[in-house]
Amino acid sequence: MASIRELHQQLVKKERSAVEITQEALERIEALEPKLHSFLCVTAERALEQAGAVDAKIAAGEEIGLLAGIPVGIKDNLCTKGIPTTCASRILENFVPPYESTATQKLADAGAVMVGKTNLDEFAMGSSTENSAYQVTANPWNLSRVPGGSSGGSAAAVSSQECVVALGSDTGGSIRQPASFCGVVGMKPTYGLVSRYGLVAYASSLDQIGPFANTVEDAAILLNAIAGHDPKDSTSLKVAIPNYAASFKPDFKPRGQLRIGIVKETFGEGLDSVVEQAVTKAVDVLQSLGAEIHIISCPRFRYGLPTYYIIAPSEASANLARYDGVKYGYRAPDADNLLSMYTRTRATGFGTEVKRRIMIGTYALSAGYYDAYYLKAQKVRTLIKEDFEKAFRVVDVLVCPTSPTTAFKAGEKTTDPLSMYLTDLMTIPVNLAGLPSLSLPCGFDDQGLPIGLQLIGNVLREDQLFQVAYAYEQATTWHLRKPQIS
């Protein structure tokens, strides 16, 4: 499937209609879903209606935006009015939101075509999309491998070209890690850049919505559409949003002397040698484009994982207290009193990993342990943020691997939670600091599985991240390789 800009030109020149483009996406979804399981819900009827509205505008001589008529996948933890939003959980099995999330509303206003809701780890808690209550998504590059998580459905859908772009959410790496595993571009914006209104909460101080795309430019276009202040979200930032793709040119090179820092702590034990080699070669490419390379130390980077697994479950234990079978979603049958209904609903409605994190969070917040765990974790979070602040006084952009490994086999880590958690080792500190970060393809291992390069920027420097990523993308061909799904 072509890029956003290419499809836009085809629509404007009336070489193709939005309905034709949408029909092509729906046919591809129908053909691939028995193997991939990227989508929990395909919204064919709504998609064709939205596409028809775009065609009517074109026929009337009206101007259309870049996203008009473009097939988009939506992670199923973003509320969509009249369309089921399950968070891949039994407890929200029949939940149909009465309102639209700000991010999806902005896409609808831009004329984008929603082709369906994508699979995820239940309540976005996981790193492989194996925690979904409904189905396990496969990696398009190797169907026996996981696509990453928690936004594995969105990553797989974009990688396999079931849709042009997709939305995901990132709490500790849930956009960037699956982007790395599936060989696509994934961006976690600065905390507060994109409204969280209508995003089902996991850990409110960490959650952020962002784009998946096959190219850096497409990711930039999608982020432009969803970014901006929203009075419905008290954490939404009041800042001007630049046109991220405005300075992209075929021979683009970063302006001025770009200083890039290699995060020293991300190399060493636990990092696959093939990943290390690919990232090192990517740094060489950036240096050849004129970047000045520095070795940077972020000494508390390694404390990100334990810090996250106190803070995120603590917030989750509070956020998920609302699911009790009273107002919406699943309600356990045969309960003989209110307390029994609560306990049975939560015991049978939540999956194993969600219950594990609720218990961890409840323990960390309990009397006698709050200071030792939650309060201490918040102090370490501040120290991690300070390390990044010091680094950005020396360099403009930080680089490191997105994940220590390439995609692992389905079932390989399901009985070992700690091993699963370690796949987000390099993405989590960025969420704790609220920084923007982007993953893009930088190579493949000897089994043909993609490797991701992570670029980390200072607060609200998405523009700089996109420019560096675009320069690297134009100097390489990794993004041109596509999975052959047999």
Swiss-Prot record:
InterPro entries: Amidase (IPR000120), Amidase_CS (IPR020556), Amidase_dom (IPR023631), AS_sf (IPR036928), GatA (IPR004412)
SUPFAM superfamilies associated with the record: Amidase signature (AS) enzymes
Catalyzed reactions per annotation: L-glutamyl-tRNA(Gln) + L-glutamine + ATP + H2O = L-glutaminyl-tRNA(Gln) + L-glutamate + ADP + phosphate + H(+)
PROSITE patterns in the record: AMIDASES
Organism superkingdom: Bacteria
Key word Ligase present: yes
EC number of the protein: 6.3.5.7
UniProt cross-references to Gene3D superfamilies, sorted A to Z: Amidase signature (AS) domain
The entry's keywords: ATP-binding, Ligase, Nucleotide-binding, Protein biosynthesis
Cellular component annotations (GO), alphabetically ordered: glutamyl-tRNA(Gln) amidotransferase complex
Main EC class the enzyme belongs to: ligase
Active site: 75 (charge relay system), 150 (charge relay system), 174 (acyl-ester intermediate)
GO annotation terms (biological process): translation
Annotated GO MF terms: ATP binding; glutaminyl-tRNA synthase (glutamine-hydrolyzing) activity
Subunit structure: Heterotrimer of A, B and C subunits.
NCBIfam families, alphabetized: gatA
Family: Belongs to the amidase family. GatA subfamily.
Function: Allows the formation of correctly charged Gln-tRNA(Gln) through the transamidation of misacylated Glu-tRNA(Gln) in organisms which lack glutaminyl-tRNA synthetase. The reaction takes place in the presence of glutamine and ATP through an activated gamma-phospho-Glu-tRNA(Gln).
Name of this protein: Glutamyl-tRNA(Gln) amidotransferase subunit A
Gene responsible for this protein: gatA
